[in-house]
Structure formats: structure tokens, C-alpha cells
Amino acid sequence: MQDWPLRVMRLVDHAEREHGDGEIVSAWADGSVTRTNWRSIAHDARRMAQALEAVGLHRGDRVATLAMNHDRHLTAWYGAIGMGGVLHTINPRLFDDQLDYIANHAEDRVLLYDHMFAPLVEKMKPRWTTIDTYICFDPPADWQGDQAFTDWIAPHDGDYRWVEGDEREPCGLCYTSGTTGNPKGVLYEHRSTMLHALAEVAPDCFDLSTNSTALPIVPMFHANAWGLPWAAPLTGCELVLSADYRPDKMVKLFREEGVTHSAGVPTIWMTMIAHIEATGDDLGPLKTVTIGGSAAPRAMIDWFRKRGIHVGHAWGMTETSPIGTLAGAPRNWDQMTDEEQLGWTARQGRVPFGIELKIVDDEGQELPRDGVTSGNLLVRGAWVIERYFKFDESATDADGWFDTGDVAAIHPDGAMQITDRSKDVIKSGGEWISSIELENAAVGCPGVAEAAAIGIPHPKWDERPLLVVVRSPGAEVCEVKIREHLEGQVARWWLPDAVEFVDELPHTATGKLSKRLLRERFREYRFANAEAMTGRD
């Protein structure tokens, strides 16, 4: 057989050659909408590759972006990698010290950014010591700052051949959100990225085809936008990109562009569902949503199912490129009751080919796949980290297993269910209480917009759960109503010893609930009557 390295620019070539007229729509932050296609994107990416070489970039150099989702950002992905560089997507929601650290640690040479982030860029320039070229994607007409992207690539004709090489060369770099310590870099290879894309388009994963219209609500700066910028050119599907995540704008975009497939974290779906419930709007021909980043509440899954929209519950992390599991339908799906289907979808799904999972106890002994036993979740596979960028030591054990930091159960059919993060499990009387399951049950209570459960020290039980709740707008739900709702949904001894109401919960730069910040906020909190334990005495 021929030697045909799995380099990701072959995906762009394929989309250009076989699906050149496939449309790419960009909804910009200023409300404007632009349209292009795979052929034009590929041509402009070649022009950008020429522009990068003209400013002295070489194979392996890092090219950074600080931008939302739009076609110029997509062009930058392909142009940077096509000239042999490594694309480093920077999350603008990080703290200044983190932005300082990752750009310098990555030794970025070029930064392309959105005008909306210009104040941030100007503030950080003195601290970014390795970047010598700054390009603005979308400057206003009276812009007096860095060179505009279109002007930068204008002198180049696009007569360019992508840099070839080994499929194990790096092509992408993402940093973890760094909830403790400095963020860590994860370096992606051409081969791992290609295999991830091939797995992602399968029916049991994102189920994309040429006839799909995909809209990732995942930012392109977060975990490779869940791989959709590579899965889309593989199929040649139409791609809709939005820099504006306001729910009314998103719902309008779904409907007008005929979006069939989408992916996002629960918080963004919550805002869209609330908008639809308040206005009577709809999501058009949407067929499939993928929900990940944190566990999707059963109430959310049920909301989509009642509207004929398939829910793929996913799990992954920056270290897994990011897809690790996805909830495609099992073989006996049609024989399941509605309640059984809902329960199955609430799990994080099964692995695609290329990924392996197991759970172990604290001594490293493998635990059974019985759907009941929980343990530390380990993963290995074709697109799983081996070591962090610029780290000498391996991130895995001798057999290649990476400790995810999650606690999970694996069912006999292979379906995995996250029960908690290892550091978020509430340890009460020698037993584990899943904060995730408690939170998801609470969110199903009318009037509860968001909920978080954390462990509070207790003199008898070690820890007991505190439930922190954000009410829905205009709702007057109280602790009694929430406790009544939870009765029968969780074990009685899981019931929170107190419920506190707040205006908002803290989130990380990637939109996940920050239990660390929440624990800091309630560090001195103690239950009013610590000896009167509901359901335990």
C-alpha cells in the first residue's frame, strides 16, 4: 500500500476538491453575516501560509489566535498548520497572569486576534516577549492599530503547496484551564487529529454527512472546538460559525441557516431553552445536539427529546483531543421504554474505536463494569496525551493509562457514567455522594436555573452536602420546595443539609462550574445544627 501520511491538510484539500461550494457562514459580533465556501477558505489559507513564511516563520513555530468563531479564524487554523506551524488557540477568558504564562511558555511568534480583544492585546503586549507579529482579523474602518488580516494576505497569490512531513509532527496546541497552578500545554499531532476527526463523523458520534449543517457553540479557542473544524471538511458539510452567543441571536441563526447538528456545554443550552420557553421561538430543523463539558441534567435531555431532537451526551477533556465517549444509541434502543432511553442518554456514552477506558480503585486495581461500582477513570488511545508540552515526565503510567481525575462507573454494555470529579466527591460517613447527580436532580426542580453541591466539614460525618442554587428569573422557589423535589430522586442521606441561594455561580474560563472558587467562598460556612443529620441518624 502507498505511504500516505495522515496530515490534516489533506482534509482541507478534500473539502476544496470534492465539496468546494459547501457554504461556511459567519455571524459576527457586530451583527453582520458573511458567507464563503470551502474553496475560498482553502485558497485564503494558502495565502496566509505565504504571509507567515514572509515574516520569517518556520516549521514547528507556534502561531497563536485570540478570537471567536468565524471564517477568518478558520482560515488561520488551516494557514498556520499548512505552512508547517503549530496552531495555538488562546482562551481570552483566562486571567492576565495565565495569558502571560501560556503565550511565553508556548513561545508564540505570531498572534491573530479579533478587534473586540484589542484592549486585552495592547495590555498584554509588554508581557508577551516572543510575539513579534500582530494581526487583527476584523479592524474597523478607522483602525490605526495592527495590520488587518485581509491586507496582510493581500500581496500573496495562494500558489502554495502545503508543507509535507511525518504524520506524527505537531499541528495544534491547547492549554488546560489551569484551575490549580499554571495551565499545561497539550500538543496534538497530525495523526491523532486526523484519527479523531474520522471517529467523530461516525453515526454513533456526531453523525455528520455532506448533507449536514453544523453549528459548534463551542468556541474555537476551547479544546479544538471539539474537533468540528476538522470533522466538517472531512464530510464537506456546511458550517455555521457564530461570534455572538446571546440566546436570541443563536436561536435565530439555528432557524435561518437550517442547522441540523450542534454541540455545546449545558450552560449555553440552558440560556437558549429559557429564551425559547419565554418567546415560543424554535430551533428549526435541528436533529442532533451533543452536550458535554459537564453533565447534562435529565430535564435538559428530556426537553430536547420531547421535540424530536436526538441528544448525544459526551465526555472528554483537552488531554483527549477532546472526544472520549459519546452516547450513540445501543443495540436494544427500540426495545427500551422512554424512561430507559432517558436514563441511558444521561450517561456519557461509549468509546469510539481508538479509545479505551477502565476504572480502578485507589490502589490501582481494576474494578468491574457493573454500572454500580465507581472508581477512578483512566483512558488511553490514539488521540490521548502521552506527556504535557515541555514536560520531561510522562503523563501516563507504564501501560499508557492517563488518570483523568474523574470518578465514574462503567456499565456492562460499555456505557460510562461520570459520577464526579475526584476532588468534588462529597465523602460522608465513609460513603461517596455524587455532587453531579445531586446537582442534576436539583436543576430539574421548577424555578432552579443552576445548582452546585459542595462538601462542608462536619464533626460526625466528615462532610455533608451544601446545595448552592441560582433561581430562574422571577422564580421564588424555596428550600422546602427543593427538598420536596429531591425526595425520591436521590438517596435520603444524600439530601443537602442546607440550601443557599446566590445570584450567580462562579465558572472557569471554559464555562465550567468552578467548585474551587465556590469552596473558597463557603470556606467558613458551617451548618446551623451539625448534629441533626437528615436521613443519617
What label would you give each PLM region?
Residues L234, E256-G264, M270-L342, E356, ...:
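Gly/Ser/Thr-rich phosphate-binding loop
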Residues L11-V12, Q50, A54-V55, G82-D151, ...:
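Structural core segment of the AMP-binding/adenylate-forming
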Residues I24-H70, L74-Y78, F95-D100, T150:
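Conserved AMP-binding/adenylate-forming core of the ANL superfamily
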Residues V351-L378, P412-D413, A475-E479, S514:
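Conserved beta-loop-beta connector loops within the AMP-binding
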Residues L11-N37, A141-Q144:
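AMP-dependent adenylate-forming
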Residues M83-G84, M194-T213, F221-T260, H275-I276:
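Conserved AMP-binding/adenylation subdomain of ANL enzymes
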Residues L52-L57, H156-R168, L173-L215, G227, ...:
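Conserved adenylate-forming
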Residues T65, L94, L111-H115, S262, ...:
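AMP-binding/adenylate-forming catalytic core of the ANL superfamily
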